[in-house]
Swiss-Prot record:
Glycosylation sites: 557
Protein name (database record): Natural resistance-associated macrophage protein 2 homolog
Composition-biased stretches (Low complexity): 62-85, 106-118
NCBIfam families named among the record's database cross-references: nramp, Nramp_1, PRK00701.1
Spans annotated as Disordered: 50-119
Positions on the Extracellular side per record topology: 173-182, 246-253, 308-326, 398-421, 490-491, 549-565
InterPro entries: NRAMP_fam
Subcellular location: Cell membrane
Any Gene Ontology CC annotation: plasma membrane
Taxonomic source organism: Dictyostelium discoideum
TM stretches of this protein: 152-172, 183-203, 225-245, 254-274, 287-307, 327-347, 377-397, 422-442, 469-489, 492-512, 528-548, 566-586
Length: 629
């Protein structure tokens, strides 16, 4: 026990100098292994303000506190035993309850209207209970890697990988491959690495704070800023849904010959599909996603064998190079690969794996490790599909000097150029499956974003209907006015909009996970901060280049309408978005000042060490010289 504490009289004035005095003394008392009857001089601060110098056995209040602590420990042990009894195998860990049977709060959530159905996959009766042991076993060795535990964590990243191979990705990959060959493969690789870094930050934020990114934004920013962020993310989700509508319609056209406008109308019925699958448990939902993704992957494995790309040309595509003509397509690839709403969805689905409430460092580290493995496996699968699409376009279309401007045109060209209908049918089937799998995660992401930012909760089917309606209207107008070619242009624009919305998710994510006040000891290391800052600067720079190119193209267009829209709408909107992004950074200026001070302190410490070493060397040399003399 601390002697300084024992010699110090406590009173009301200096009580705050030593927080939780009795708790400190009890802890020391237990650490010394003293028996209950052993006398130990301590100071007890009574409720009346008197200080009593006595022993533990003479203090009824101390004995009462000790009994209460023992009772609490017994209750905790009973709860842990009960929790261990409830832990079952990974295939039986899911409480397969429907979405609408769940009614719990988001974050603090006491002020959220819980009437109506909600997609709250964090709730314990719709989650997976994962068994955990301490990072250090009794013999002091680290806990071993567990396949059974990994199986419990596999799944959340499947929802994220869906967004990395939706019809919007197909459009940008096909255009990139048919126009520039293998030249943009490095953009896909960099986008995948970038996505892995960002998704791991999302995992860390969710595990440490128990909040997804939208909930944390609501805590850190004002209501006005949150409303603007919500609107930007809603636009990104509608853009994603627009790609799903067009992709599904084209897939139906390829497989069954349905007119595009009829296919767009049919896509509105997928609300009924979501109403059906929302009654499933989360593991069955993950298995459905896995089945769809496996079928898409197999389609393109066969496509690659049929297209026979040249290996040397494939590897040359990983050398970074970019020109003014490919900037727009590269931006679309980045937006299609690293989708902003995925950063919000991932944090929420990660919380479906329930870990012990004590939030021990070892538990969080284990959960983080298994979630990262899940993410790496799922995103690399999505990366393979995207690379396969671009390689297919390069080896078939670019080699034949054909630029693809429509997805349906890609189907017809595959039939002609590859001497058979198998590749074309697989292409149409994969496109249809990609549209349907994206439908499932789109509604989940929209509900999470809406609840997280503005605490608004509506029924999932109503949310799905509104989002799909906002996507169907522009798709139908474009098909009627411009025909099939217009849908392809609309797909590219939707992916550019996704990329423009990405910084508004990435910047807060990096700031939050690098803050000690939010993350504690789990905050990002300096090297991770630098890497993610480079990623953010790359995204912002690419978006600025795209916006400038769009403004320049519209201003030099002969159409008066294009010039008016640019001056009245596009330029003010671009300025407003830049101002909002700056505000997200400036409002957290303490983070940047702390970061700079940390960098300078490290430099000063290194300089001081060098000075000390030089002085020591100089002193040593001086002594040696004197000795010689």
């Amino acid at each position: 026990m601390n002697n300084n504490n024992n010699n110090k009289k406590l009173n009301k004035e200096n009580l705050n100098e030593i927080e939780n005095w009795n708790e400190i003394e009890l802890t020391d008392y237990k650490k010394q292994g003293l028996d209950e009857g052993t006398s130990s001089n301590i100071y007890l601060f009574e409720s009346n303000g008197n200080v009593v110098n006595g022993s533990i056995e003479d203090s009824p209040k101390q004995q009462q506190q000790q009994q209460q602590q023992q009772q609490q420990q017994q209750q905790q042990q009973q709860q842990q035993q009960q929790q261990q009894q409830n832990i079952i195998s990974s295939d039986e860990e899911i409480e397969d309850k429907p979405f609408q049977d769940r009614d719990s709060n988001i974050g603090d959530g006491s002020d959220i209207d819980s009437s109506g159905d909600s997609i709250d996959i964090e709730n314990t009766d719709y989650s997976i209970l994962v068994p955990f042991e301490d990072e250090e076993n009794n013999n002091g060795s680290k806990s071993k890697f567990s396949i059974k535990k990994l199986k419990s964590f596999l799944g959340p990243a499947l929802f994220i990988s869906v967004g990395y191979m939706d019809p919007g990705n197909w459009a940008t990959d096909l255009e990139g491959g048919s126009r520039f060959g293998y030249q943009l493969m490095w953009v896909l690789l960099f986008s995948n690495i970038m996505a892995l870094f960002l998704q791991t930050l999302v995992i860390k934020l969710a595990l440490v704070t128990k909040n997804d990114l939208a909930q944390q934004c609501r805590k850190e920013y004002s209501k006005t800023v949150n409303i603007f962020l919500w609107l930007i993310l809603e636009l990104a989700i509608i853009s994603t849904d627009l790609a799903e509508v067009i992709g599904t319609a084209i897939g139906l056209n390829i497989l069954f010959g349905l007119p595009l406008i009829a296919g767009v109308a049919i896509t509105s019925l997928d609300t009924l599909l979501f109403l059906a699958i929302q009654r499933w448990g989360i593991r069955k939902l993950e298995l459905l996603i896995l089945l769809l993704l496996s079928m898409i992957t197999m389609c393109f494995v066969i496509e690659l064998f049929l297209s026979k790309p040249i290996a040397s040309e494939v590897f040359s595509g990983f050398v970074p190079r970019l020109n003014s003509d490919s900037v727009m397509v590269a931006t679309g690839i980045v937006g299609a690969t690293t989708m902003p709403h995925n950063l919000f969805l991932h944090g929420s689905v990660v919380k479906s794996r329930k870990i012990p409430n004590d939030r021990r460092k070892s538990v969080i580290k284990q959960a983080y490790r298994y979630n990262v493995i899940d993410t790496v496996l799922a995103l690399n699968c999505a990366f393979f599909v995207n690379i396969a699409i671009l390689m297919l376009a390069a080896s078939v279309f670019w080699k034949s000097n054909i630029q693809v401007t429509e997805l349906s045109e890609a189907y017809r060209l595959l039939t002609k150029l590859m001497d058979g209908k198998l590749a074309a049918v697989l292409f149409g089937l994969g496109l249809f499956l990609a549209g349907q799998s994206s439908t499932i995660t789109g509604t989940m992401a929209g509900q999470i974003v809406m609840e997280g930012f503005i605490k608004l909760r509506i029924k999932p089917w109503l949310r799905r209907f509104i989002t799909r309606l906002l996507a169907i209207i522009p798709a139908a107008i474009v098909i009627i006015v411009l025909g099939d070619k217009g849908t392809y242009t609309l797909l590219i624009i939707s992916q550019v909009l996704l990329s423009i919305g990405l910084p508004f998710a990435v910047v807060p994510l990096i700031i939050f996970t690098s803050s000690y006040e939010i993350m504690g000891e789990f905050k990002n290391r300096l090297s991770i901060i630098i890497i993610n800052s480079i990623i953010a600067l790359f995204i912002i720079g690419l978006n600025l280049a795209t916006i400038f190119q769009l403004i320049n193209d519209f201003l030099h267009n002969d159409s008066i309408i294009s010039k008016c829209l640019t001056i009245i709408f596009l330029i003010p909107l671009s300025i407003a978005l830049c101002c909002l992004l700056l505000w997200l950074i400036i409002s957290k200026i303490n983070f940047f000042t702390n970061l700079l001070s940390k960098i300078f302190n490290n430099n000063n410490n290194n300089n001081n060490k060098n000075i000390i070493n030089n002085n020591n060397n100089y002193s040593g040399n001086t002594i040696n010289n004197q000795t010689i003399q």
